[in-house]
Amino acid sequence: MYGPVLRADRALLSASREDISTRCHVDNTIATVHEVMLWHNPVLRRLISESAVSTKRIAVVGAGVNGVSIATACASLGHQVQLFDESTPFDQTSSASSRMLHGGIRYIEQGHIGLVREALIERDGWLRFAPNATRVERFYFPVYQGSKRGRWLLFAGTLIYQWLAGCFSVGPSQLHSSEDLKHVFPSLIPQGLCGGASYCDVVMEYEPLIQRLVDEARKQGVRIVENMRIERLYSDGRIDTADQTLEFDRVINAAGPWAAKLLEASDVDSGFTIDHVRGSHLIVQASFRHALVLQAPGERRIIFVIPLDPQHVLLGTTEQKHDISDPIVCTDAESAYLLEILNQHLSEPLAASAIVSSFAGVRPIVRPRDTAPGDISSASRDSEIEISDRLISVFGGKWTSARHLGGKVAALV
């Protein structure tokens, strides 16, 4: 059975890490931690029991991390699932992430505590699901004179982050002197360095992880249909391709940034709309022992610097409003912005020639249609699910919570 947690109860959340990791017998089968959580919930037990005698034909549109997770969760309940994508799995937004499986420490400052807590629980699930494609990394906040956030404030934030993780914590928060940081990062500018704070989080090995997800989907019986553009959705369970109409018991719109646009093209009313935010990253030739979280001077934004291997780091991300009809690329201005922030912290600035490559993706920020757009940096990355007869649409979400979202949608089928 697939593993997303719909909602772990208090008893399970308060159990020790060892207790939770213990494999248990459920109805004469061996269950993982997430299966135990699923079966511990009586509502889910009833839904799963009903699904065993009510197999449905399901179409999932969009093979990003949300679509793959939803398809896998549905197939694990015995449904016949076809997963359609205009290109190939993980070809768009899901391929352009910051390579982190995390609670989102910056969301604490914005007040999205529930989202952070949920994602931290799910982070543990990723470590168990793909131990060979995930790793724990320590992230350091260097603090300079004049920084928007002082080291004690940052340390307090990391402690809250660790506390929210509870028994799912992957390492302690730490307060650092300037000498500590100079030792770990000798390339940092020493003048004005006041010390900092650090915390632990999880980084994905992208290619092995997406292969693990695709393999799991196929193992559960999902039929993946690549290079198939879906032109139109219907509330009665039909979908139109370029040359035929297919009928299903349920259709799940998991088209990510294009979910709302697909509904509009299908003349299906929705109470939600999507704001599109482009996030760009650089892969830079540089060497760091651990990850850095840099405060953008004069802003409240933060930039991650994550080691990929001994010679390269991932630098990102930007946040720019994006017209979904425009090409999704990292602009020259974004490249210069990211490199400048890194260079403002280095004794020996990097030249533009150190940029090995760049990539960009568009994140869908969901909001009710009758509300005005807000600040994109503080907007929630939470998800919304909308049901219109046999059509289920999924808006928003983030990598870390995708398997949790998959379970929620599967329970609604």
Predicted feature residues:
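N-terminal Rossmann-like FAD-binding beta1-loop-alpha1 element of flavoenzymes
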Residues: R57-Q82
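Core beta-strand elements of the Rossmann-like FAD/NAD(P) dinucleotide-binding domain
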Residues: A242-R250
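Glycine-rich FAD pyrophosphate-binding loop
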Residues: S76-S95
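Flavin (FAD/FMN) cofactor-binding and adjacent substrate-gating region
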Residues: L38, V143-Q220, V225, R232-L233, ...
